[in-house]
């Protein structure tokens, strides 16, 4: 029940954990750093998977599966890659009761094992582009874990593509980060900033990393998806060459891109409240709950509730009836608010007699009367669409209200305690590291979206917020998950 949840104002971190566990989304495992994704949480992941998988296939990608064990010699082939991931790796040293001749790494990501196969499959320009996605689990040995946001094992998808030239590879990088943006904004109702990572924040082994960054309700940033231009780095490491149209050998150009179950954590923190989970209808496996008020002729009320549910389900609106008598209607109202069901329909004998029902929205708690007529399904569908749009607009307004443009160091320090700060940066790793050391804020993204850049005059030259040196652009700073 909702009374188990600490308020956001009292303790935001505890609110998040309370909500995840009370809404039965996930729980702690007996395995250190790992979580159990419960049915309510996994249902959200399934909705995310279905939407994303459809978008991947629309852009020409196919699914495959590669081993979770990676030979140590493969990992060592890409020096920058292993340097970035070595501290997080889990290593298998024994199998079948014997010490292994070569250690096996449990995949922290799959570039190396996948490129060992791509080397065999790619011989000619006719074999390109190769556009493959994998749905899998990965392991990164995290020291400080939090359900969905940072766990030792998590679920994700990782796309790995090979191309004949750098231009096509870059087009793929941008195409896929825009797929993630579309998913975040149209399905998650979560506004994101699209852009490029700084050199210190980019993926280990990449030439460039692009990302989408979202603001959570505590003002912190969450990296919700990444798309990497790997150049020819992995192709050279695995000697993956192809014969060009001109008949000469060249190394292929590569990309990789991925999102994970951390998106569920982002979804929770972007929209939910002190009463529990708030879900955008497009990602709710159960969009409508009908709660019959069982007075008078109970079976007649039940029959009407089931008839409405059948009509809504036939219309593509996922609906169920809770006509159990173990708990009161009030208890059910609170329970389904906790679980984030977008719409609740209350239906009693008087409502049936008057040819109407009461419809309650989870996002605003607004109640309206809806007629029990032929247009009811369209009316409920319109309410669901309004909820989806309202959640996006509310989150966008929150981000705008908690974004500041800083021109002094004092403004900067105050701003990162509240949300995003847009400020000039001199482009050096040294200044970036100093800002992080002094404020815990990092460069989240160098925006590429023209509308966002224009809104905040990102190309305006100025003075670096920390060093005082000349700066050619502004970037987005924030504390982050």
From Swiss-Prot:
Family annotation (Pfam families): HGTP_anticodon (PF03129), ProRS-C_1 (PF09180), tRNA-synt_2b (PF00587)
UniProt-listed Enzyme Commission number(s): 6.1.1.15
Annotated localization: Cytoplasm
The family this protein is said to belong to: Belongs to the class-II aminoacyl-tRNA synthetase family. ProS type 3 subfamily.
Self-association and partners: Homodimer.
Cellular component terms (Gene Ontology): aminoacyl-tRNA synthetase multienzyme complex; cytoplasm
UniProt-recorded name of the protein: Proline--tRNA ligase
Top-level taxon of origin: Bacteria
Catalytic activity field: tRNA(Pro) + L-proline + ATP = L-prolyl-tRNA(Pro) + AMP + diphosphate
Keyword Flavoprotein: no
Record function comment: Catalyzes the attachment of proline to tRNA(Pro) in a two-step reaction: proline is first activated by ATP to form Pro-AMP and then transferred to the acceptor end of tRNA(Pro).
UniProt keyword annotation of Chloroplast present: no
Alphabetized InterPro entries for the sequence: aa-tRNA-synt_IIb, aa-tRNA-synth_II, aa-tRNA-synth_II/BPL/LPL, Anticodon-bd, Anticodon-bd_dom_sf, Pro-tRNA-ligase_IIa, Pro-tRNA-ligase_IIa_arc-type, Pro-tRNA_ligase_II_C
Keyword terms: Aminoacyl-tRNA synthetase, ATP-binding, Cytoplasm, Ligase, Nucleotide-binding, Protein biosynthesis
GO annotation (BP), single: prolyl-tRNA aminoacylation
Organism the protein comes from: Chlorobaculum parvum (strain DSM 263 / NCIMB 8327) (Chlorobium vibrioforme subsp. thiosulfatophilum)
Major localization class: cytoplasm
Matching PANTHER family: BIFUNCTIONAL GLUTAMATE_PROLINE--TRNA LIGASE, PROLYL-TRNA SYNTHETASE
Domain notes: Consists of three domains: the N-terminal catalytic domain, the anticodon-binding domain and the C-terminal extension.
Cystine bridges: none
């Amino acid at each position: 029940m909702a009374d188990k949840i600490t308020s956001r104002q009292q303790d935001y971190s505890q609110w998040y954990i309370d909500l995840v566990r009370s809404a039965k989304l996930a729980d702690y495992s007996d395995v250190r750093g790992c979580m159990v994704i419960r049915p309510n949480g996994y249902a959200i992941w399934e909705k995310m998977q279905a939407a994303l998988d459809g978008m991947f296939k629309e852009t020409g990608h196919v699914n495959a599966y590669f081993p979770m064990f990676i030979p140590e010699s493969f990992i060592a082939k890409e020096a920058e890659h292993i340097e970035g991931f070595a501290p997080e790796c889990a290593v298998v040293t024994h199998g079948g009761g014997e010490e292994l001749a070569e250690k096996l790494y449990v995949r922290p990501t799959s570039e190396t094992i996948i490129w060992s196969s791509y080397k065999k499959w790619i011989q000619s320009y006719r074999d390109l582009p190769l556009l493959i996605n994998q749905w899998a689990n990965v392991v990164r040995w995290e020291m400080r874990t939090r359900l969905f946001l940072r766990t030792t094992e998590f679920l994700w998808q990782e796309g790995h593509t090979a191309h004949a030239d750098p231009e096509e590879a870059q087009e793929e990088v941008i195409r896929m980060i825009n797929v993630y943006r579309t998913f975040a904004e149209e399905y998650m109702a979560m506004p994101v900033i699209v852009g490029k990572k700084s050199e210190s924040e980019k993926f280990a082994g990449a030439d460039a990393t692009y990302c989408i960054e979202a603001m959570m309700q505590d003002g912190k940033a969450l990296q919700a998806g990444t798309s990497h231009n790997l150049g020819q780095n992995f192709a050279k490491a695995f000697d993956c060459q192809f014969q060009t149209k001109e008949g000469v050998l060249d190394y292929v150009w590569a990309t990789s891109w991925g999102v994970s179950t951390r998106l569920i954590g982002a979804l929770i923190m972007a929209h939910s409240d002190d009463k529990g989970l708030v879900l955008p209808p497009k990602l709710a496996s159960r969009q409508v709950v009908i709660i019959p008020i069982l007075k008078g002729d109970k079976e007649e009320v039940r029959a009407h509730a089931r008839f409405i549910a059948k009509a809504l389900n036939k219309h593509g609106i996922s609906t169920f009836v809770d006509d159990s008598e173990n708990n009161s209607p009030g208890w059910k109202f609170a329970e389904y608010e906790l679980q984030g069901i977008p719409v609740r329909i209350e239906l009693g004998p008087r409502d049936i007699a008057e040819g109407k029902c009461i419809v309650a929205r989870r996002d605003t708690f607004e109640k309206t009367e809806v007629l029990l007529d032929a247009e009811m399904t369209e009316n409920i569908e319109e309410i669901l669409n309004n909820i989806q749009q309202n959640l996006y607009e509310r989150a966008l307004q929150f981000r705008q209200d908690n974004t500041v443009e800083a021109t002094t160091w004092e403004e900067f320090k105050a701003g990162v305690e509240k949300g995003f700060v847009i400020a000039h940066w001199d482009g050096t790793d040294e200044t970036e590291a100093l800002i992080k050391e002094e404020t815990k804020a990092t460069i989240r993204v160098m925006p590429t979206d023209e509308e966002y850049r224009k809104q905040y005059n990102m190309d305006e030259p100025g003075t670096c917020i920390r060093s005082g040196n000349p700066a050619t652009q502004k970037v987005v700073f924030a504390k982050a998950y």
